[in-house]
């Protein structure tokens, strides 16, 4: 056979929440990349090795390792503010002088993100819609769409960061969730 299937025993506990798994992987992999980036000099952290690189128009340019990793953290802040109805967060909080400072901030933002999504999920409210007044023209987004958006663009940015770190001579691994689950 080319593969074997092993059934899991029936469980009275609900099956593993794939969204929660992806959020944990996102936070863990981002922490790993920040740990790798801590080996960069301050010049390498801010070096514009991809001038003009823009992931999302509203997010601005992300030409350096620091800018890309900062955008991963900042985007969670933006969406947390949207969900809570808070003011648009200043980008300065994620434009840290180094990876160590950003990593510490990431821990706090990550906890808030994990808790927020978990609470809405447990309450069965991921289908709720948020009218985002932070957008230039207010838009509406279902919460599950916000989570999908954050995870999608975070994954994209993590791969950009991996490539950029490699250009600085740092191997950050593949970021494969299967490898992460084994560690």
Where in this protein do the model-derived segments appear?
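Acidic catalytic patch
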Residues: 119-136
